[in-house]
Amino acid sequence: MEQKKTRVTIVGSVYAQPGTQFVYMGRADQCESCTIARVCHNLESGRRYEVVAIRAASHRCPVHHGGAVTVDVAEAPVEMRVSPDIARKNTTIVVKFPECDEACETFAACHPIGVVEGQKYIITDVLEGEAAPCRTGPSPVLVRVVPLPEGLPRYTP
């Protein structure tokens, strides 16, 4: 089993359950006066995280009704659709979202929440399934991606 790199952070108590996923969206205005805000905000904005362990510490929080809890999180894999010419397992990609219409039935899969455009990801799996129709190019393929871990430069064609 692969060991995931974890970070200690603080989340609202309703999210403090192993397996809960969330997308970190950045600081709220109410955080400016908080003495422990740096622990809450040690994540990368726009990325998807999964709670992997709960710690005993709980805190009052002006943002989260019911307080906040210290947890360990890891970056969560995200399923998305990509061009078939780059859909290969263990390939590093720089995400560039296609320019298409939000009314497209696969728009959300091609522009998933929790993936940051312009950042590097590794395709960990090419998933089987029906081809998705696309009006602007070849039918995109469903893959699972994880952010490229820090400190691991990879060749990207």
UniProtKB/Swiss-Prot annotation:
InterPro entries linked: UPF0179
Pfam families: UPF0179
Family listed: Belongs to the UPF0179 family.
Entries under HAMAP family matching the protein: UPF0179 (MF_00498)
Protein name: UPF0179 protein Mhun_1135
Native organism: Methanospirillum hungatei JF-1 (strain ATCC 27890 / DSM 864 / NBRC 100397 / JF-1)
Record lineage: Archaea, Methanobacteriati, Methanobacteriota, Stenosarchaea group, Methanomicrobia
